[in-house]
Curated annotation (Swiss-Prot):
PROSITE patterns: PROKAR_LIPOPROTEIN (PS51257)
The keyword RNA-binding belongs to this UniProt entry's keyword annotation: no
Record's protein name: Outer membrane protein assembly factor BamE
Gene this protein is translated from: bamE
Signal peptide, first to last residue: 1-16
Predominant location: membrane
Lipid-substituted positions (N-palmitoyl cysteine): C17
Compartments (UniProt record): Cell outer membrane
Family membership noted in the UniProt record: Belongs to the BamE family.
GO MF terms, alphabetically ordered: protein-macromolecule adaptor activity
Length: 131
């Protein structure tokens, strides 16, 4: 009986840890609104890659289409927002693009990342220089 109560207490206390806080998770390509505004019909794949980065889904069956996917999970219920942005090519040049992304949140996400996840750089200047 005592062991059963101990097991139940441990199970309940560890199960409650996940309810308190879930860290927001951002994955995929974070496309900036300024980059989308710079897209133009007739640009090459190299120019698009410089603006938006490498596509998240390289599809050999649709070589004339680049898909950029990003996801954001922010609440405790693990609700995930998925955004897809697609660039279409013909003869290696941009024809059109469509989709959605996180345009209003890109600057906010970039600024809040160090607060949420900590700094990635060393604080000691000697370590920053590689010494």
């Amino acid at each position: 009986m005592r062991n059963l109560l101990l097991v139940a207490a441990v199970a309940l206390s560890t199960a409650g840890c996940g309810i308190i806080y879930k860290q927001p998770i951002y994955q995929g390509n974070l496309i900036k609104q300024t980059a989308v505004e710079q897209l133009q019909v007739g640009q090459s794949k190299q120019q698009v890659s410089a603006l938006l980065g490498t596509p998240s889904i390289p599809d050999p069956f649709h070589a004339q289409r680049w898909d950029y996917t990003s996801t954001q999970r922010v609440d405790r219920l693990a609700r995930t927002d998925v955004k897809n942005f697609t660039v279409f090519f013909e003869n290696e040049q941009v024809v059109r693009w469509e989709g959605d992304y996180f345009p209003a949140q890109d600057e906010q996400l970039a600024k809040s990342a160090p607060k949420q996840f900590g700094r990635n750089l060393a604080r000691d200047k000697k370590k920053q220089r590689g010494r």
